[in-house]
């Protein structure tokens, strides 16, 4: 164990055996024990924050509503690497030559392709998962940065559409808030096949306003099927792209979004199916 009894007193002589269970903390009659995490300890399958959360759940019989995603450090702007030019084209002298970051996406079929000043798109996060204020802030930020933001699968807030210079209307498996008018309001339509993270049910977050935007009952569990029920193969994806293109009168690009998996095969299918943009 962690402790050994010496002359009737417990001493933590084997601290390397501690798994963060916190039983000693609960059993100590004098509340004299404090359990602290070891930041450099990488041996545990369940980290210290995980154990603390498990204990909290056991005590409260409920889970904490919080953001989800990987706990590891994610890349930021300092991690962006621009592929250097060497022989194929002369390097740019940054002191004398301008460097453009503007890009045009989806000009093969769409009458109004996406034109971005900054080629870093804001990921899809829906209203309900984010507050109205957060969605409005992303819309304002995307406009200031000259890029595009995304409705996510929770429908489109009128304020979001008003504040975002460019806004992608997501078409996900749950089809929350989806209509022809919704699709036509977007500067692009994104068919979400997969994504990097997925939270749980979240029915307690379906307020009256979320209900109105998503067009589902208040307090209901907003469940999204694991896949689009009408997209089961390559031909179905091609038909869906064509359908959305017709609904939007060929005016905006059609995007297909995948999670990381069999990337080469999936991208090939989406490109053959007529996708304007693949993310």
What are the language-model segments listed below?
Residues 140, 144, 155-156, 161-163, ...:
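Alpha/beta enzyme core
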